[in-house]
Amino acid sequence: MTHHKTLRLILGDQLNPSHSWYKQKDDDTLYLIAELKQETDYVKHHIQKLCAFFNAMENFATALNTAGFNVLHLTLDDTDDDKDLIELLKRIADKYQCETIEYQYPDEFRLKSQLAKFKSDSSLNVIATDTEHFLLPFTDIKTRFTKNKHVTMEHFYRAMRKQFNILIDDAKPTG
């Protein structure tokens, strides 16, 4: 059994080959891409959507493997005994003697809460990082919105357009 210091979780909607995680290979890092029953049952999904989602995960795992990264891709059959994501993370971290678990901030509140609780309860070093697939980093969102204040998204979108020069011509909106 190979020992890995770091376990990096890749969720199914985080298949971004441009993420900074993949700029450098590290033999001490194991990337985990796992199909989980909990992700099929929390809301009704069309079977073709699930198949496409899992196929994309498998293809991403294969691409990372081909690029020389250590990747563990687990199918639904492989994770059948894991009741949820946290149980899976504990099992894999224990199996590979990982000291650190890293994950990218989930887009869904449900998973964000699950992983935040795991982070606070775990004896392992658990680190959350940005997904890098949005214009605005996750940690900057709090600076854009005042707590307990009504927010109009129109103003937020205008500020984003100006900051990133999207649909702006001569400092004026084009669309």
List the predicted regions and their residue ranges.
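Acidic-and-aromatic substrate-binding clefts and catalytic sites of carbohydrate-active enzymes
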Residues: D77-K83
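Short, contiguous clusters of charged residues that form electrostatic/catalytic patches at enzyme active sites
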Residues: N55-E58, K83-E87
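Surface-exposed, flexible loop/turn segments at secondary-structure boundaries
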Residues: N16, E39, T79, F109, ...
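Beta-rich, aromatic/charged-enriched effector core domains that present basic-aromatic interfaces
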Residues: D84-G175
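N-terminal beta-strand-loop-alpha-helix module at the start
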Residues: M1-L76
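Short strand-loop junctions, especially beta-strand C-caps/beta-turns
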Residues: L76-D77, P106
